[in-house]
Amino acid sequence: MNSIQASEVKKICLACEAGAGSSLMVKNGLIKKAKKAGLDVEIVHAPATQIPSDSDIVVCHTGLSGAAKAAAPENTVIVQFTMFMNDPSLKKLISDLSEGNEIFSS
């Protein structure tokens, strides 16, 4: 299971399937929550098959986790969610980042 210390996270990629509205809502929600928590992290959006190689964490819907794992660099942390709004795993990610915790792949 991959992990990363919160202090090492510089870039989070929200992986999507087609770039439709739902994944953009998740990205914008993450940006808003990260800003509110005072986090200095870049949050980008990319197709699950084209994860930027400098991504420290990839956030994706469970249905895209296989494609995201295949496209992401080997040690990248993959955080999966099931609900596009108010998913507990996304809340935990922001909480772990702001508290300086170690973040694990889900």
Predicted segments with their positions:
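Short, polar loop motifs at secondary-structure junctions
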Residues: 46-48, 62-66
